[in-house]
Amino acid sequence: MFGAAGRQPIGAPAAGNSWHFSRTMEELVHDLVSALEESSEQARGGFAETGDHSRSISCPLKRQARKRRGRKRRSYNVHHPWETGHCLSEGSDSSLEEPSKDYRENHNNNKKDHSDSDDQMLVAKRRPSSNLNNNVRGKRPLWHESDFAVDNVGNRTLRRRRKVKRMAVDLPQDISNKRTMTQPPEGCRDQDMDSDRAYQYQEFTKNKVKKRKLKIIRQGPKIQDEGVVLESEETNQTNKDKMECEEQKVSDELMSESDSSSLSSTDAGLFTNDEGRQGDDEQSDWFYEKESGGACGITGVVPWWEKEDPTELDKNVPDPVFESILTGSFPLMSHPSRRGFQARLSRLHGMSSKNIKKSGGTPTSMVPIPGPVGNKRMVHFSPDSHHHDHWFSPGARTEHDQHQLLRDNRAERGHKKNCSVRTASRQTSMHLGSLCTGDIKRRRKAAPLPGPTTAGFVGENAQPILENNIGNRMLQNMGWTPGSGLGRDGKGISEPIQAMQRPKGLGLGFPLPKSTSATTTPNAGKSA
């Protein structure tokens, strides 16, 4: 564009006005481009006459913005709503602008013109389709009355219908409640549009997609010809009416309009407000709030905690397995086993009641146990199943000494070869098995067990086998000589296999002598 300054146009000064000439050339090129755009728009249907009123009102705004912000290159760039027609200079009186004015006047003879000045005509003509109604975006339109809309229903073109679809008529009611703002009355709308341009642009950016789906929800006189939402009611509705209107909306539309801080796409049906939408795994387990109560948001499903009758929970229905545990009546148990189980169960119940009362002297029970000689012996044991609990009670040591004294006295009065504390059944060993190991050793010294008391070999002190013994004679008949080893060559064993005998009741863990083997085999050379 600055290359055009080198050329000498007809009627222009050669020096001193180069800057003014380049500026004028820019404006001329810009006017030609806008005129071409206007002709293409008229070929597709042109502007409707309804927008001229809003254009004439917004012209002072555009003139002020043009003075303040300087010139711009093209009018169809993305600007603020008040920056659309700022490219022309009002003080330009050069002769180069006259052809452009003649061209514009000849071009607009077939249109209805409401403005007298060239600036207003240029601003109205150069307004692109994307910025047609930016000044009223976020506010209610100036031509929203129902009689005006009814007059223009029939003669709307396709181009006009596309523009009206994009218009945001009003704030959503839930957002207006959030911001605690009320809509201005009808008389103040023009004044607000002149004085509050910054807020108007903010509302334009935030409410681009807010009313895209309102033609589906609102019924009756509020819809005039496709997507145009024209409200005949006043804005002084109560909060109750607003809540009733919001309950009619679909849940995804509620979520898409609830957050006003994120911008969405302006394509039809495309909502990208992800902050208020839900994922597939969290689909609306809150929307059903009736009296019966839904399970996980599914209507009509009554949960189990509401389905059960509370009277059924109070009934003591006997559990057969639990009853069989209590009574000992298992199907696989024999009759004596059941009786023994019931006897032990009743005895344990009696012991628990006695443990609560803890008297000074604990009663003893005498159980007949068959002894090794054939006589019956009365065995003394403590009936307390939790005998080890006495070690942790305050009088544990004195009570244990009394039990030890009773056992020792009974052992001295009885047979010395019998044990006074021998246990023959599983439940009595349970009572005595809780004593410590040192107590068991002291008790065995006081009341020796039947059988050998010390470890030794079987037949250690036995007499040698006589030669007239039957076994000895059999071996001699087979070729064995006394004093030699067994076998054909006499290299076998010469002494009988030694069997280790341990004290009674100590079990397999008793330490054996290191020099001998612990295997217990029948003694071949022991005398009968």
Curated annotation (Swiss-Prot):
GO terms for molecular function: nucleic acid binding. InterPro entries: G_patch_dom, Splicing_assoc_domain. Residues 63-77 have a biased composition (Basic residues). Signal peptide: none annotated. Keywords: Nucleus, Phosphoprotein. Residues 98-117, 239-252 have a biased composition (Basic and acidic residues). The keyword Protein biosynthesis does not apply. Residues 36-119, 232-282, 487-528 are annotated as: Disordered. It is found in: Nucleus speckle; Nucleus, Nucleolus. The modification Phosphoserine is found at S115, S117, S146, S195. This is G patch domain-containing protein 2. It comes from Homo sapiens.
